[in-house]
Structures are given as structure tokens and as C-alpha cells.
Amino acid sequence: TATAEGRVVPGVRHCLLRIEDPTWPAGWSTAAATHHRNAVRPDPDTAFRIASVTKMITATTVLALTDQGRCRLDDPAAAHLPADVVDRLPLDGRAGPGTVTIRQLLDHTSGLPDFFSHPAIWAAIRHGGGRRRFTPHDLLDLAADAAPSFPPGTGRAYTDTGFVLAGLLVEHLTRAPLHEAYRTLVLDPAGMDATWLESSADVPRRRRMLAHDLDGRDITDMDPTVDWAGGGLVSTAADLARFLRALTGGRLLSREAWRAMTRWRPGPAGYYDDYGLGLGRYRTAAGPLVGHHGVWGAFAFWAPGLDAIITGTVSRARVDRRPLLEAIAATLLSA
């Protein structure tokens, strides 16, 4: 607890943290006063937006489909997407220098422009009262406003666009809404009954979430459609720990799919030391930390050398959580 309290970023209204390891399975949380009408004081079961931590779950869903033989990672993505989606972006080589594969959607090597950097997205986030809603197709149209960053497979740049396409691919292959595919392929097998896609009909009744701050502005009321398969899930620290236990314990994917997911390459600039498929890795003095963080404050990491899991969130968006994660891992190593 002392380590976590000493590493929380100044200005954070609350931090929710869960730590599990073989010798110390524990959940810890702390709360500060908050005045947003929809906010709640955190406890270990409080839900929060996990933002890009969603990418781990989207990638796992796609990999589960590869295990079922419905697609292969090196298939052209366009082969498993509706024509109206393919026509929106340079996926099949007709409008660009190369063909984007499913693998490249998940490892940020597609070269596709990132819709999440579009001014319209951030206007919607900062002025949530406007209630602008985005369909996945709207998000792709925003991405199409910019040129590709590089030919597919020749570079690496973080882009949520690949994961929105992955979500559409999942829907096309399963003939089901994304939230149902998540539930069938990942959430139910992992025992995650407190996780849902916020923009879907899967939202539990009477569930409230932690408030989120962005540059001093309360953005709790922003519309949840701004990211979808790249960052639209809501979860709890306990559910994220269940996901990591199921994923790393071999209950969600075959060994072959797990090896593909953890085939590490240098990470996108400014994000991770290494990146696989929807999965990042930090190299630390206490050993590697494998997982993902999200822009609104969420984090979910596994320390394989310690068999420890660290999950949770802080209320402030776009803050660096790596020092907190490294401090916790170092404390567990020395315990």
C-alpha cells in the first residue's frame, strides 16, 4: 500500500489497484472525494473504462477464431471484411502499396492512419454533453481523412484503426455483434461477469463507473462510441485479473496462438518496449511486465517471473503508470 500511495500521480482523485501473486493474493483500493453526479467511491468491485486494455481482449477474440480455423493471421484482412469496409481504407493494395493482413491489424504494422488522433474525436471527448455518437464506419471515415503512415509491414505506429477493423472482422466471421462474440469467446470462458462493451446492449443495469479527468475536465459523460473495439470495454480490477489468469494459463487460446500473441518486436514509439498482438511488454529491473494500459487510466499487467498480476486504474487520463507498475513489481520481488 505504501508503495502504491507513493507512486500515484499528483492530482489523481482516486486510484484502484489489485495485486495478486502466489504468496499475496490481495486487492487494495483507495478513494478521494469526487463531486461528479455519476461518480462512485472505488472499491475492489467498482467498474471503470479500460480504454486500450480492450485491445488485449479484441486480439484474444481474433486469435480464438484462428484456433477455430475461421481465419489465419497472415490472411489479407480484406478477405474477411464486408466490401463497404474495404472500400473505405487502403486494405487490399488497390489504393496503396501493399495488402494489410490480420496480423498487421493487431501489431500496429498496418500503416493505417489512426482515427483516434482526429480532432473530431477529441472534440467529442472534451465536450461530452454534445453526445456525438460514432459508428465503426464513422471511425474508419475519420481515419481515411489522413494518408497511410507507411506500406504495410514496413514500420510500426500505434493505431486504433486496426482494432476497429479487427472488431468488424470478428462480427463478419461470427455473424454476431461484437459484444456477443466477446462474451462467447473470452468473457464467459474467463469468468468475467462484470465486463461489458459500453456502447452495446450488454450494459448491466444500475452499474456506475469511476469518474475520469482529462486536463482538469470531467469527461465521465463522454459518449462511449469513440473507440469501440480499440477501447470501448468497461471492467473491474478483479475481472481484468481473471482475464490475465485465463489468458496466461492457457484457458482461452492454444499454445500456438499464445506464441503468436507473444512474438515480440520493438514496440510503437512512446508506448511499450516490445509489442506482440494486442499485448505490450515493459522490460524492468524486476523482470518483464506483459499487458496493456489505457488512455483513461486503466492498466492490466502480468509479471511472468513473479507470476503476479497488477490491475486497476487511476482517475486521471494520459498519465504514465509505468513507475507505479515498476515499483510494485520491485516490491513483490523483494518481499
Where are the model-predicted features located?
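Short, well-ordered beta-strand elements
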Residues: G27-T30, A300-A317
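Short, conserved catalytic-motif segment at the N-terminal edge
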Residues: T1-I50, R70-C71
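Short, surface-exposed charged micro-motifs
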Residues: L16, G278-G280, F299-F301
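Alpha-helical scaffold elements that line and support the substrate/ligand-binding pocket
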Residues: E20-T23, R49-R72, P76, H80, ...
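Short, gly/Ser/Thr-rich active-site loops of penicillin-recognizing serine hydrolases
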Residues: R318-A335
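Short, surface-exposed loop or secondary-structure junction motifs
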Residues: R88-H292
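Active-site-adjacent loops and short helices of periplasmic peptidoglycan-processing enzymes
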Residues: N38, R70, D75-P76, G93-A95
